[in-house]
């Protein structure tokens, strides 16, 4: 009798979730930001020191009154180093986070919550972009103590900085999804990211090509 009642009872189909899971998205974003903030010496402070070393070495080697497009070489170099910092750190954050979770076999903890593919993408990309921008603020403040600052367009600075951070965060996420081990991430970094960074006009004008 119970079986007959169960069979005769129509199945109830729960409606699909609609709208964005804002709380889940914020939780993922906050988790990723907390992941690199708690080791700020490695993820935030070290890139600032590295950038200042680049500035020091190239200023000593190619400074000495040399100008590029009418600017002292150090003033030409500083914005390029700032943008290079944004690109490299935004890429490194998302790619490293995903490959670590895959190798530690705890990526299921990220995939199981009720987050759509778009929400996962936004969470990872924006957290990577945040790291790139946080490092750039530290680098910019440090460079401002050494190099004269001439801001011609705040809107252009914000547009290109945020756009570059989001672009490289997206590329880092694609790399993290594709990679199966750290060697794969290193391959993309060493053969694509670094060459593009060094040949992008950071250290010399692109008119030299």
Label each residue range with its predicted role.
Residues 1-209:
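Hydrophobic transmembrane alpha-helices and immediately adjacent juxtamembrane helices
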